[in-house]
Amino acid sequence: MTTTTTQAPEARALRDLADLASLGHLPGLVRQLQGLGGCTNPIRLDGHRTEHPIDTTTGELGPAVRHLAASDLPAGHLLVRCNNRRATRCAACAETYRRDTYQLITAGLKGGKGTPEQVATHPRVFATFTAPSSGPVHNRPASGRCRCGTQHPADTPELGTPLDPDTYDYETAVLWNAHASKIWARFTIYLRREVAKRAGLTQREFAEHARVSFAKVAEYQRRGAVHFHAVIRLDGPDGGDTPPPHWASAELLTDAIRAAARVASAPGPVLHGRAYTFMFGTQLDVRPIRSADFAGGTELTDRAVAAYIAKYATKGAETTTGTLDRPLKFLAELAQLRISEHARRMIRTAWILGARPELEDLRLRAWAHMLGFRGHFSTKTRRYSTTLGALRQARADWRRAQSESTVPADSTAAEDTTLVLAHWTYAGVGLSRGEEWLSAAHAPATGLEGATA
């Protein structure tokens, strides 16, 4: 019985492929799926797209030179990548997101993608900001033994779980996650003030001499608390295009970061007679990006930092804490889920707090699966480097150029004299078993850019 259940999906895939082959659709479907880059959860669209040339002298609309109808495509629909960054939801799209994040971070460290190469000479640091403690948890200290008396192996599921769940402050842990993005926003304000203070400048004068640029990602620790990894850079007043002032240094930047992290705070609610104020934890790590120790004796290089940050860009709470990668509809769903008891308590706490009127703006029930955190996992300042949107557009332009290279030049109207009429409607999501198998066969390989960091 077990064998039949295991082979059932493969049998359905083979039947789908056989049907497509008998209709003569298989070669065309392969070409259509290749454009998804291995995405197994694409958006399906119904509709059409028509191109008409325009006479630039009379403005007259000519007959259609191209027409694309979704129903004429091998899959019966136009298929669009889901672009989900979560590796647990779509490994192929998450891998593309990781590579794009790697390129984005790298461009801000050594130039490229429209960012000047001189940024490599600007003061740059790699900083990690953590959450405060909500109670003792199982860990692997330098002494080798946890406070519970056990020497835990690196892969034990107990790591990050409370020594005493009944006294662990789950409410504070969830509320800190919910306010983490606000703390970061306050930190960036204080950082500019602290840098200006050390340079002997006022806030207004600082803007005329220098600019702080950064890129950061959020990561969950095993205890379920969010912390931030960030590349922070000191530029001239116009960003990476201008050299930083003579007083700018990695040492000054490091000192300013530590000072700003100590005072940055976000006001919280009043619960059970307790007024909350949230700040970063005391464990703050700031390292200049140059020939310095990073981890295990390796150098803190541009490539290592970019790979380290990109690695976490595709992970959510489900990867580290064993929780969910989708929102809950009902709290009763928890009873059926195979998740850790610690994650279950964090989710339940967020759900219960979400019912309180004074916490309505935090939308804790909508973000219970994220343990309260509702911020963006990857953010950056405008002048740090290129954008993910620009990288996606460059990739789309390249694919379009490749597809049009086989079309005779005189058969296509110039882009600026063509009217495009398009109408698309949502038709569903996902692939059939056969389509899924073919798409997975064209997924991008992992373990390339910076994957070893």
Over which residues does each language-model region extend?
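Catalytic micro-motifs at enzyme active sites that drive phosphoryl/nucleotidyl and oxygen chemistry
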Residues: 75-79, 112-117, 200-222
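Helical (often loop-to-helix) elements that flank the catalytic cores of nucleotide-handling enzymes
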Residues: 231-273
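Long, contiguous juxta-domain segments that are non-catalytic but functionally important
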Residues: 74-124, 129, 134-145
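Mobile, glycine-rich extracellular loop/lid and propeptide segments
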Residues: 193, 213-215, 221, 241-245, ...
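Long, low-complexity, charged/polar intrinsically disordered accessory regions
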Residues: 1-89, 95-98, 280-453
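Histidine-centered divalent-metal-coordination microenvironment in nucleic-acid enzymes
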Residues: 90, 127, 205-239, 309
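A solvent-exposed, charged loop/short amphipathic helix patch at secondary-structure junctions
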Residues: 139-175
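A short, contiguous, amphipathic alpha-helix enriched in charged residues
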Residues: 177-209
